[in-house]
Amino acid sequence: MATNRRVSRVAELIKREVSQMLLNGIKDDRVGTGMVSVTDVDVSGDLQHAKIYVSIYGTDEAKVETMAGLKSATGYVRSELGARVRLRRTPEVIFLEDRSIERGNKVLALLSQLNHDRPPENLLAVEDNTDEDDESFSE
């Protein structure tokens, strides 16, 4: 078993190398239909498996096509990792779509909507109470 420090260093190295491959190495047209970025890499403790989380910007169809292209390119990505990274064994690569950015945007939109729907009277009542409290302290 590798130490946590080594696992995190290998994960960062894989993230950097796969990002470079997405820019220059993968020639599959399906991968280019959506803008792809590597958001995170989880490497198992024995360094045998790497889950690569990707964020894809584009339509739902482009996301499906891009994921299909990435899944078909896993063999290429693994062999390139073996050539670029010095490890005893090259980890198995699994691409997973990261939807955390979409979920974050939805949460921000909901919070903005709640803030917008709040009646202004509540805000004025709070402000009036603070002014009265301030006067009582100055006496």
Swiss-Prot record:
It is found in: Cytoplasm. The keyword Cytoplasm applies. This is Ribosome-binding factor A. One of several proteins that assist in the late maturation steps of the functional core of the 30S ribosomal subunit. Associates with free 30S ribosomal subunits (but not with 30S subunits that are part of 70S ribosomes or polysomes). Required for efficient processing of 16S rRNA. May interact with the 5'-terminal helix region of 16S rRNA. Keywords: Cytoplasm, Ribosome biogenesis. GO terms for molecular function: ribosomal small subunit binding. Disulfide bonds: none annotated. GO terms for biological process: maturation of SSU-rRNA. Residues 128-139 have a biased composition (Acidic residues). Residues 120-139 are annotated as: Disordered. It holds the Pfam family RBFA. GO terms for cellular component: cytosol. It comes from Nostoc punctiforme (strain ATCC 29133 / PCC 73102). Its main location: cytoplasm. InterPro entries: KH_dom-like_a/b, RbfA, RbfA_dom_sf, Ribosome-bd_factorA_CS. Gene3D superfamilies: 3.30.300.20. It comes from the Bacteria. The keyword Cytoplasm applies.
